[in-house]
Amino acid sequence: MLDDSFHVYDTTLRDGAQQEGLNLTVADKLVIARHLDELGVGFIEGGWPGAIPKDTEFFRRAAGELDLKRSRLAAFGATRRPGVGAADDPLVAALRDSGAPVVTLVAKSHDRHVLMALRTTLEENLAMITDTITHLRREGQRVFLDAEHFFDGYRSNPGYALEVVRAAVEAGADVVALCDTNGGMMPNELADTVRAVAAATGARLGIHCHDDSACGVANTLVAVDAGATHVQGTANGYGERAGNANLFSVVAGLQLKKGRQVVPHDGISEMSRIAHAISEVTNVAP
């Protein structure tokens, strides 16, 4: 990672691995992580330890086999369950014990999803966010938050979506990534929303886009123009349904078109080779 002022965050090993027909072994994930480290991404999300046995094994093996020079590993997981303290939740404990210096938590930011999917109150969801971030920070880990379905939630209840962002920041999250989970946003509306959230909360914002409307890369780039300093995506745009924002295209757009260095120069010169090397592992064309 060049410095902490701008994050390139890869989620190939977790979100990208959800693509139909893509079945990565632990050994595959270790190889891909080494390629991403060559590129010089800031963070590599390794998976969900505790919830997915293969990902638990990845973090165990990574501790002894993965010598990252440029990137840092991140563990992905959820906030604590309703009615259970973060210190008593075994899935939160698995994040703590993963060995990853960074944890990215996913949390509901759409009021209807809190009520219908989590089957809890809006207040308890905020408490879950606060408690989990506070606990992991106390354990010495850096915490990012993925605000799931944020843009749909902001349309439905902007006040509550903003409460989620504020709760995360006040608890100690370094970044709140706004997620276009359904991939339905258009660039103009997305950029306007990012600006509004930044102005209302003062949070350091990230962006996580899916490509269902073929706007994943464009939406990521306009989010940066609107103030986001943390971009998420996957190698070759891998991901469920239509895929995630192609992180290689995002990096090229930022560095070659907009003049913003986000990975080392030797990394970007090798990006085409790295894209094809990863496709050899996944057996999915770039």
Model-predicted regions and their roles:
Residues 1-286:
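Catalytic cores and adjacent flexible loops of soluble metabolic enzymes
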